[in-house]
Amino acid sequence: MHQSSWKSRRHRRRGHRHSAWFRQHGSNERKDAGAQQSPQGSSDGHGEAPSTSSTAGSSSVPDLPGYYFDPEKKRYFRLLPGHNNCNPLTKESIRQKEMERKRLRLLEEEEQQGKKIARLGFNASSLLQKSKLGFLNATSYCRLAHELQVSCMQRKKVQIQSSDPSALASDQFNLIMADTNSDRLFTVNDVKVGGSKYGIISLHGLKTPTFRVHMHENLYFTNRKVNAMCWASLNHLDSHVLLCLMGIAETPGCATLLPTSLFVSNHAAGDRPGMLCSFRIPGAWSCAWSLNIQANNCFSTGLSRRVLVTSVVTGHRQSFGTSSDVLTQQFAVTAPLLFNGCRSGEIFAIDLRCQNQGKGWKATCLFHDSAVTSVQILQEEQCLMASDMAGTIKLWDLRTTKCIRQYEGHVNEYAHLPLHVHEEEGIMVAVGQDCYTRIWSLHDGQLLRTIPSPYPTSKADIPSVAFSSRLGGARGAPGLLMAVRQDLYCFSYS
C-alpha cells in the first residue's frame, strides 16, 4: 500500500509539472500574440502554393510529438491516430483547413480588389508614359500591357443553354479543349449515372455584358475513361476530335476519331456528317495529331514502352520502342519530329523520316527528375516547354539541349496536368494539383496571377482551363475559360 501511494504521489507531481509547463507556455503565447503577426505576401494575391506543413502558421512554436498547436486558439491539441471518432483530428484535416482558409482569403481579395499590378511600379499610366518617353519599345510595351490585362481579369459565370437543362445541373465537367479558332469548346462531362458524355459549346455568344453560350448535344455515349484527347484536322481544320479511351473488362482500349459534324446543330457550311473511326490501340496514355506534311493525316499514340504512328487513310503503323511509358506527345510543324515525354523523366524526339528499325530515329534527348506530364513546342520550334510530376516547369533550348528558364510555383505530385503556352500574349497557364490556376510571363518566368478555385480544394475537382487570344472567334477578346464541377467561368480582358 505504501508503494502504491508513493507511485500515485510521483504521478501527480509529474502531471503537475507537465500542466504547469503548458499553462506557462500558453501564457507566453498570449502575451506574444500581438508581436507574432506573419506577413501574408503582397496584396495582389500572387503568393506561393499552400503549404503542406500542419504548423505553417506557427513555426516559432515547438513541435511536440503527438500534439498539434492551433494558432487561433493558442493551445495544443492531441492528435488521435486510428481513432474511430466521426471527426478525428488528423494532419490531413488540418492541412485542408489551412488551404481552405487561404482560398477564401484569396477569393475575397479577388472580389474586393478589381485592379491589380502584376509587376511593382507598372500600371496603365506608367506604361503609357514610359512608352512615350522611349523607355519601352513596341514589343516590350505590348508584352507588359498583356501582363497588366491578365492581372486585372475578373471572374464572370457563363450561362450555358442546352436542350437538356437537367443534365447541365448534374453532369460535371471533366475536360475542356478550345479549337484553333477559339469559337468552339469540346467538353467531356462525367454523367451522374456513370460514364462520360461529350459535347461542343459554341463560344460565339461569349460577349460582355451577357456571357451566354450554347451546348450542342450528341448521341455518342461511352462509359470508358478518356485518357487523352486532341483536335484532328482530317477533312478540314479541327474537323474531328481524337480520343484515347481506356479499356474495361474484356473490351480493349481504342483511339477514336469523332467527327464534330455528328453534334446536333453544329454542321459547318458544306460539311457533311462524318463517320466515326476507331483504331484498336490498347492502353494509350497520350495522343497527338500531325500537321506536318511529311506525316499527313497521321496521329500518334503513346503507350507503355512504345509509340505508334498511324496513318488514318491507309491504316499503316510505325512502332517505336521506348524504355518507359509515354505520357505526353506533340508533333513539330516544320521539322519532321515527334516529341515525347516519358514517365522516367526523359524527353526525346522521333525523326519521322527514319524507319522504326535501328536506333537512328531518336533525335533529341532531355531529362527531368520526375515523370513528364506535358510538352509544348514554341512557334519557332527552337524551344520546348515541359512540366513534370514534381511541379517543375522548364523551358529548354533544343539547339543546345540546355534549360534556359524555370517557372516556379506550380504544384503537382502525381496528376497528369497540361500546360497552356500562348506566345502572342507572352504568357503560360497551368492548373496545379492544389486547384490554383497560375499564369506566368514567358519572357522572364514572373508569376503574374494566382487564381483560386471557386470551390473548395479537392483532388477530384481540379479545374480544366482554356486560354485564347480571341474567345468566341476572330473578333473576340483574349481571356481564360475555367470549368469546374457543373460551372463554366470566363476571365476576360476588361
Curated annotation (Swiss-Prot):
Bias-annotated ranges (Basic residues): 7-20
Gene3D superfamilies cross-referenced by the UniProt entry: YVTN repeat-like/Quinoprotein amine dehydrogenase (2.130.10.10)
Provenance organism: Bos taurus (Bovine)
Classification via InterPro entries: CUL4-DDB1_E3_ligase_receptor, WD40/YVTN_repeat-like_dom_sf, WD40_repeat_dom_sf, WD40_rpt
Region feature (Disordered): 1-65
Oligomeric and partner information: Interacts with DDB1 and CUL4A.
Repeat listed as a keyword: yes
Metabolic or biological pathway, per its Swiss-Prot or TrEMBL entry: Protein modification; protein ubiquitination
Family matches, as Pfam families: Beta-prop_DCAF4
Biased composition (Low complexity): 51-60
GO terms for cellular component: Cul4-RING E3 ubiquitin ligase complex
Identification of the protein by name: DDB1- and CUL4-associated factor 4
